[in-house]
Amino acid sequence: MTLESPSTRLMTCQSSLLPEKPRFLSQKMWAPHLVVAYLIFVTLALALPGTQTRFSQEPADQTVVAGQRAVLPCVLLNYSGIVQWTKDGLALGMGQGLKAWPRYRVVGSADAGQYNLEITDAELSDDASYECQATEAALRSRRAKLTVLIPPEETRIDGGPVILLQAGTPYNLTCRAFNAKPAATIIWFRDGTQQEGAVTSTELLKDGKRETTISQLLIEPTDLDIGRVFTCRSMNEAIPNGKETSIELDVHHPPTVTLSIEPQTVLEGERVIFTCQATANPEILGYRWAKGGFLIEDAHESRYETNVDYSFFTEPVSCEVYNKVGSTNVSTLVNVHFAPRIVVYPKPTTTDIGSDVTLTCVWVGNPPLTLTWTKKDSNMVLSNSNQLLLKSVTQADAGTYTCRAIVPRIGVAEREVPLYVNGPPIISSEAVQFAVRGDGGKVECFIGSTPPPDRIAWAWKENFLEVGTLERYTVERTNSGSGVLSTLTINNVMEADFQTHYNCTAWNSFGPGTAIIQLEEREVLPVGIIAGATIGAGILVVFSFAALVFFLYRRRKGSRKDVTLRKLDIKVETVNREPLTMHSDREDDTASISTATRVMKAIYSSFKDDVDLKQDLRCDTIDTREEYEMKDPTNGYYNVRAHEDRPSSRAVLYADYRAPGPTRFDGRPSSRLSHSSGYAQLNTYSRAPASDYGTEPTPSGPSAPGGTDTTSQLSYENYEKFNSHPFPGAAGYPTYRLGYPQAPPSGLERTPYEAYDPIGKYATATRFSYTSQHSDYGQRFQQRMQTHV
């Protein structure tokens, strides 16, 4: 805005007061008047240089939010007169109170030249250009623009507060911010996250100042958007923080289905449970099940249970769930383990020599199968694929081929397919055949090749025959599925027939085939030999069976003899002492047997026969380690000790029983009676002068009469107290250790830990004997045995 000086305005005002020069008057007539006016103006301007009126502060552009207070300043210097404000050129009035404008008033000190315009509760109508004028001084201020900002009156999302949408169908969310000045800006949020891509437009209202903003956000709802909150925020300079409004989505969608199988891997024939888990909005109305595209009747629940077969591996099971919106179908295959099943069968093939042949065989199995092609009667694998390719085939390639499928740990299956190769006849009979002299014989000629032979002829010696009978010879032809058989039958086979070669020749369209067959004699065993061998084998079987029965019987009988006598209340204490020398006078053996001995014999008599029987069946080998073991072999049941004084009571002495024959090392096998029967075993040995130990041991002779049988002998009495010995040289009789000879012969020399020969080899056995663990070579033998029955 250009400021005008007071002199300039005055001149303008004065010039406007001058009358307009008539057009018809000449310029000379007005010249004096112009000069006078000019002189007056100059006089006035020069007369008032210090009292010039001017604006010290003029109104400026302002921006105010609707409802707020606005003040437009206006300050004049050297002026006392009327001041008024104009709004868009319209005078608001004079004075401080503007009655026509209740929200407007002039404020400030007039003495200070302040004529400020105050506007309270600014409205859109206050949005205008304002000017301050000093009327008497003919002064006008520059124009000030007052801009009133209007926030959006309303922010709204179409369709709220809940918008029902269809899953998968695109939809535009529309937000509107009404009557804002300036136009509002709209921002979208999805669950608090700002969204991009909205399209915004504005509409100008009729007042030309306010605008409505429209924003559209394109979404494609899914079932996951159910309950999702979208927020629209509108803002402008009047409301920097903006206004918000929100809506919630309700998405209708077809069922969302998950189909599961339990168990996931099964064998053919096992039971499987299908479970169809579904969520939908609105609610689910029902279920439908199908297999391989065919509806399964009576299956209308979320679970379907059935026994599976191999078809479930290739034909899917589907579950369809539906509601008002639509339906969802989910399918699955079952991992069924099953044996191979053929899909494409191999076909018999006939071809010519030199052609290429392809044999096809297709299997299915689970787990993945292994496929092999082999030729019959051969283990060579020709192919591992569904097809077997044979190039330039010959008649040797003809035959039966096997297509075998293997499913590990499940099963094996195979199919056979014949391959026929056209060619001359091939005779596959044995070159040497057999017959029995004097009986009827047959010579066979078999042709299995293709095509079948048209003619088959036999030739031998000077004879030729295709079919029929010639003397003793007859030819017959038989057709079968595998080929043609021509049989030459010979009646009453003779020696000359074994010296003849038989020629079998066959013809077909590809040529002839020939085979030479030799007939040999078959040896026939006489009927007597066959019958004898049969009878002998039968007898052998019978005897073997009888021996087995006898063996089992004896084992069972032996186990029954191991019994324990528990009810007899008999206690026998036996003390044996043997001095270094023996008495010379001994009483009769039968007289020396005490009453206790007879009692013991009576007790053991029931076992005597069985002991004698088993005596020859046992042979105990002395273990030299027992010599140094201190453990009681009876586990405490028998108290056998050496170097102990005899008790004063219940002592029974027994005479020594001695065989009259040559003395020898007597290591007889122990009794059959085991420890479980409750009876001890005490090994005893014959005694003789030291000189007798050098003789070669001989088998025992018969026992001396008068009670010399030592089988019931328990101990020997020490006759040292009688100072007499029954044998010459008894004073030098060496001590011995029970169970071991003191001075073994040269053939029996052993180290302390070296095993002796079997005891039964040199001596007989004495029942109820044990070796004393404490007897030594240099001390007197002393044995004490307590028996509790």
UniProtKB/Swiss-Prot annotation:
User: Where do the record's glycosylation annotations fall on this chain?
Assistant: N78, N172, N329, N503
Query: Which tissues express it?
Result: Abundantly expressed in kidney. Specifically expressed in podocytes of kidney glomeruli.
Q: List the disulfide bonds.
A: C74-C132, C175-C232, C276-C319, C361-C403, C445-C504
List residues in topological domain: Cytoplasmic.
553-789
Keywords from the UniProt entry: Cell membrane, Disulfide bond, Glycoprotein, Immunoglobulin domain, Membrane, Phosphoprotein, Repeat, Signal, Transmembrane, Transmembrane helix
Is Phosphoprotein found in the keyword set?
A: yes
Q: Which CDD domains match?
A: Ig (cd00096), IgI_2_KIRREL3-like (cd05759), IgI_5_KIRREL3 (cd05898)
Q: Which residues form the Ig-like C2-type domain?
A: 49-147, 152-248, 255-331, 340-419, 424-520
Against PROSITE patterns, the record matches this protein to: IG_LIKE
Q: Tell me how the protein is altered or processed after translation.
A: Phosphorylation probably regulates the interaction with NPHS2. Phosphorylated at Tyr-637 and Tyr-638 by FYN, leading to GRB2 binding. N-glycosylated.
Matching Pfam families: C2-set_2, I-set, Ig_3
- The PTM Phosphotyrosine maps to Y637, Y638, Y654, Y657, Y756
Q: How does it sit in the membrane?
A: Single-pass type I membrane protein
Q: Does the keyword Ligase apply?
A: no
Give the residue ranges of motif Cell attachment site.
437-439
Transmembrane residue ranges: 532-552
Modified-residue entries (Phosphoserine), positions: S606
Q: Where are the Extracellular topological domains? A: 48-531
InterPro entries in the record: CD80_C2-set, Cell_adhesion_signaling, Ig-like_dom, Ig-like_dom_sf, Ig-like_fold, Ig_I-set, Ig_sub, Ig_sub2
PANTHER family (alphabetical):
KIN OF IRRE-LIKE PROTEIN 1, NEPHRIN
Q: What else is known?
A: Knockout of this gene results in perinatal lethality accompanied by proteinuria, and effacement of glomerular podocytes.
In Swiss-Prot or TrEMBL terms, this protein is called Kin of IRRE-like protein 1
Q: What is the organism lineage in this UniProt record?
A: Eukaryota, Metazoa, Chordata, Craniata, Vertebrata
Q: Which gene is annotated as encoding this protein in its UniProt record?
A: Kirrel1
